[in-house]
Amino acid sequence: IANHKVFFVCTKESELAASNIAARDYKTVIQQGELWEDVLALDPDLVINDMLDTPREYMEHLKAANIPVVNFEDEGPGSVLADQVVNALYEEPQNETNGKQPERFLYGHKYFCLRDEFLQAEQNVFRPAPKCILITFGGTDMPDYTRQTLDTVEPLCRERGIAIRVVTGPGYAHRDELVRHIKALGNPLLRFEYATNIMSRMMEGVDLAICSAGRTVYELAHMHIPSIVLAQHEREARHTFARADHGFAYMGIMRKFNAERLRKVFVELIDEPERRNVLYQRQSRIHFEKNKAKVVSGILKLLKKEKES
């Protein structure tokens, strides 16, 4: 799509995302009226929706304009109107249509697109004696699983001489409190990164991670990092890639943080390297490198079809 202008249309509620996108020199439009009106005002040759479940009315307006549409992570009522739906975070359909999904619905990790930074990153080699762990939860992390996880495992890491990396996203709601808390802990092996631009670098040299069940688990699998996964809500719980057969110790939905259970699983994986190695070996058989080309190829076919019509 190098010969096309690319615009990002962000909803009124996505000002943080809009500012991050604009900072990368992309043309950005903030929603002014109805979202479909703002999209059609750009007279696009193709629309790519990355907004989770699409409303049917929104999609009907786009299709009435005869514009090809590609949706990502869409299980909503509007998804059936898309020309292609890429649901990489779901291993199988969640809402079936007449018992069968159309072929234009692409499900599972074989369609997960790695960010380019991970293609250059150095994948981790298994170490029986772990030297570094990673704690990372996406989104705003309103329950502050980040701090609760840190308080659970920090004493265990301290007594074993294991370094800790804590990484939060730009929407993390407890940044100032966490900075003060980390300073009070006084652990020289503890590092905090807020809204890092190069996540792959934070994963290099990591032996075990504790995280939520979002897109990060795919990046962890690519980097060969066995992980303890805490789903933050029902939608994340449906991301079934983050299970034992792909190298993850899945703890279910954490409606109430269970420090004792987390501590037990953490100690098992830290102190029993053979258990961690089983998860590591399963991840080493997973490959995402060619997925982006498959997905982009489908998008380019839709663009070509639009030009020929």
Predicted regions and their residues:
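Acidic donor-binding loop of glycosyltransferase active sites
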Residues: 204-215
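Catalytic binding pocket for nucleotide-activated donors in carbohydrate/polymer assembly enzymes
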Residues: 217-264
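Donor-nucleotide binding loops and adjacent catalytic segments primarily
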Residues: 14, 127-206
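Active-site and donor-binding regions of nucleotide-sugar-utilizing enzymes
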Residues: 1-4, 8-101, 105
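A short, well-ordered alpha-helix in the C-terminal region of glycosyltransferases
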Residues: 268, 274-289
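A nucleotide-sugar donor-handling region in carbohydrate enzymes
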Residues: 81-144, 174-176
